[in-house]
């Protein structure tokens, strides 16, 4: 299989929708439990971006640098929980700011910094909330894309389009809210049961 064929397969509508639903369900219902894995994936992507930056500006052997930096990023984020908490909180705050105040970009950065710091201090409740919201958003986006036929390329150009798609009508709002609430309750009950088993 040629790289172009593989890229077309991975970005096909079925692959994107399936990925969004599976990742959304995992994050929504067991996001806090697998936070170390989730954090490592974030580190992998950030390391990959750093590797791409290095190869563009300083180095010519792209594959080795990108792989090495991605692995280092994944290991750092897996071993140091605070990095994942900061990035998760910052991303959540940024997207909340972009959605609520799209004309004032500076507030998105302020909210990103605020949520990054808050997530360090109230890790459990905020991480449960964030993973439930991200998971529910991924599922609602997949449902919207499946119904309307919107492709992922149409969404990636503007982050606000993600929120517009998720909250486009009352049915999607209800789906999103139900998933968030169910995710929070499920994660809380699972956490409580694990604590009782340990005692």
From Swiss-Prot:
InterPro entries: TM7S3/TM198-like_dom
GO cellular component term, pick one: plasma membrane
Domain of life: Archaea
Keyword Amino-acid biosynthesis: no
Membrane topology qualifier: Multi-pass membrane protein
Record-annotated membrane-spanning stretches: 10-32, 37-59, 63-80, 83-100, 104-121, 126-148, 163-185
The protein's name in its UniProt record: Uncharacterized protein AF_1434
Organism of origin: Archaeoglobus fulgidus (strain ATCC 49558 / DSM 4304 / JCM 9628 / NBRC 100126 / VC-16)
């Amino acid at each position: 299989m040629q790289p172009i064929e593989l890229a077309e397969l991975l970005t096909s509508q079925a692959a994107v929708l399936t990925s969004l639903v599976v990742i959304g369900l995992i994050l929504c219902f067991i996001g806090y439990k697998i936070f170390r894995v989730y954090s490592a994936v974030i580190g992998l992507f950030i390391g990959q971006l750093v590797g791409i930056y290095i190869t563009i500006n300083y180095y010519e052997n792209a594959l080795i640098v990108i792989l090495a930096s991605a692995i280092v990023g994944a290991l750092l984020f897996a071993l140091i929980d605070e990095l994942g908490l900061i990035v998760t909180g910052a991303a959540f705050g940024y997207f909340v700011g972009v959605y609520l105040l799209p004309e004032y970009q500076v507030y998105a950065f302020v909210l990103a910094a605020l949520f990054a710091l808050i997530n360090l201090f109230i890790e459990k409740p905020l991480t449960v909330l964030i993973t439930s919201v991200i998971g529910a958003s991924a599922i609602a986006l997949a449902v919207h894309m499946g119904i309307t036929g919107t492709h992922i390329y149409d969404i990636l150009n503007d982050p606000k389009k993600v929120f517009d798609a998720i909250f486009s009508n009352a049915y999607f709002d209800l789906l999103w809210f139900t998933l968030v609430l169910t995710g929070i309750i499920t994660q809380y009950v699972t956490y409580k049961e694990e604590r009782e088993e340990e005692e």
